[in-house]
Regions:
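Hydrophobic packing residues within well-ordered alpha-helices of enzyme cores
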Residues: 69-73, 141, 234, 291
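Catalytic beta-strand/loop signature of glycosyltransferases that borders the donor
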Residues: 218, 271-277
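A C-terminal functional module that forms or caps the active site or interfaces directly
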Residues: 234-268
Length: 310
């Protein structure tokens, strides 16, 4: 592993979406031990990112999580990579907008990334705090970002196969992607209630409409590669969202929908990068044992040391 001071200032930044409350899982799942020596999923994410050439990590968190993250997460690897924090709060809104009465739910991942704007320098990846993406995913995305001019609007996402990202214990939210013959994203459909169904899957929309899925569709697991040019467009999209939905108690502005809109407008392209890595995550408490077993198998096969941080 390299040290923080030896990493190039032009290395990509890893931005971690960690402000979620973990409502379905019933706890602060981002710092729940999963590895053989008490490692968290976040530990493996940072470990894989650092060995793929990422030079900084920015955690987007709620202000009341800061002490837990500094002591329970960042302290273990802050000597290896630069660590910073950005705070997502309900009242961080563009001029002219306010929080509606009774609103407690965060505004979503588009808002989270906007909250980290001042902490991001150069090209950056975005990941969920509670998803295990695998070594190859970081290598593929890190290589793409390292070779991308920071003024480019040719962005990327790592695509996983839908059937390999489902939970046996309930529904999941996935961005289901359609790509062209060259592997560029055409559309992305944020489906929020996907479950296994026969040999495939199905999603139930809010109005009760059921969408049949084969299970082979590429899906976004919120592993994205961007340049700072994203911010030229993101506040406009968030403003449009607030104008349409800002008075609602639970509506969210998802980054997959924002990217899909920009692709549709011709303002950007998004290459879907394929990976050999297996994805797994903890959506429900019952998923934890599966994740622990998967990590143990990777350690046994030499993908990771039994103790990540020495």
């Amino acid at each position: 592993m390299t040290t923080a001071t030896s990493v190039s200032a032009m290395s990509p930044t890893l931005v971690v979406l960690a402000a979620g409350m973990g409502s379905r899982y019933g706890g602060l799942k981002q710092i729940d031990p999963m590895g053989p020596s008490g490692e968290t999923i976040l530990d493996y994410s940072v470990y894989d990112a650092v060995r793929a050439g990422f030079g900084r990590v920015v955690f987007i968190i709620r202000p009341d999580f800061e002490d837990a993250f500094r002591d329970g997460v960042a302290a273990k690897f802050s000597h290896l990579v630069d660590v910073d924090f950005a705070f997502q709060t309900l009242d961080r809104l563009p001029t002219g907008f306010s929080v509606p009465e009774g609103r407690e739910k965060p505004w979503g991942t588009t808002h989270a990334i906007l909250c980290a704007r001042d902490a991001i320098r150069g090209n950056f990846a975005v990941i969920n705090a509670d998803d295990f993406y695998g070594r190859d995913s970081y290598a593929v995305l890190g290589k793409y970002l390292a070779g991308l001019d920071d003024t480019s609007t040719d962005w990327s996402m790592v695509g996983f196969t839908l059937r390999n990202t489902l939970s046996d214990h309930g529904t999941v939210a996935r961005g289901v992607c359609a790509t062209d013959a060259n592997g560029f994203l055409m559309t992305i459909d944020e489906m929020t209630s996907i479950e296994r169904h026969g040999a495939g899957a199905r999603n139930t929309r809010g109005d009760g409409t059921v969408v049949a899925l084969s299970g082979d569709e590429p899906v976004s697991m919120n592993m994205w590669g961007f340049t700072p040019r994203l911010f030229d467009h993101l506040e406009r999209i968030f403003r449009e969202f607030l104008t349409a939905h800002g008075d609602e108690a639970k509506s969210e502005c998802f980054i997959p929908l924002a990217v899909g809109q920009l692709v549709g407008e011709g303002a950007a392209t998004c290459r879907v990068l394929r990976t050999d890595s297996s994805w797994f995550g903890v959506t429900y408490r019952e998923d934890k044992e599966i994740v622990q077993g998967s990590i143990a198998a990777l350690v046994a096969h030499g993908e990771y040391p039994a103790r990540l941080w020495s």
